[in-house]
Amino acid sequence: MRKLKYPIGISDFAEMRNNGYYYIDKTNVIVDLLDKGPVEVTQITRPRRFGKSLGMSTLANFLDIRKDSKQMFEGLAISKNTTLCKKWMNQCPVVFFSFKDTDGLTFESAYGMLRMKLAFAFQDYQFLLDDDAISDDDKGIFKRILGLSLIHI
């Protein structure tokens, strides 16, 4: 029998599933979120160390169009819902970042970290700049976000 490791301090779903860590299957939360239909905002509030970042990482890995997550979700509750998996798994562009390591001692430092995280997230989608379906105006906005010049209050 393979000995599983405790995921102390790990909140990345892919790291847990790919590296032999204990994982308590909460993928039915994804089913609950996606079966509700379109909603403008879903707010998830829980105390610290309650699994919010892991839950968001799980959702990001499930939806991200840049990934092939079938094997990662194999054997989990959500994999039994084949209709939902066909409709949603790896079908969406995902921009994901966590604030768990963000120093919020001052507004300026938290804001600076947010700007950098947003620009870094946009780097993964630079291929969109070559897409003819994207307008020149949107490409210009995209480039300014990449250069941090558009992100201001």
Residue ranges and their predicted role:
Residues F73, F127-K139:
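Short, glycine/acidic-rich hinge or "gate" loops at secondary-structure transitions
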Residues D64, D68-F127:
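P-loop NTPase motor core
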Residues S57-L63:
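A conserved segment at the C-terminal end of the G1
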Residues V41-G55:
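Walker A/P-loop nucleotide-binding motif
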Residues R2-K5:
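C-terminal leucine-rich, beta-strand-based interaction scaffolds used for sensing/assembly
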Residues I151-I153:
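Conserved small/polar residues in nucleotide/adenosyl-binding loops
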Residues D32-V39:
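Phosphate-binding P-loop
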Residues I8-V31:
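N-terminal pre-Walker A segment at the start of P-loop NTPase domains
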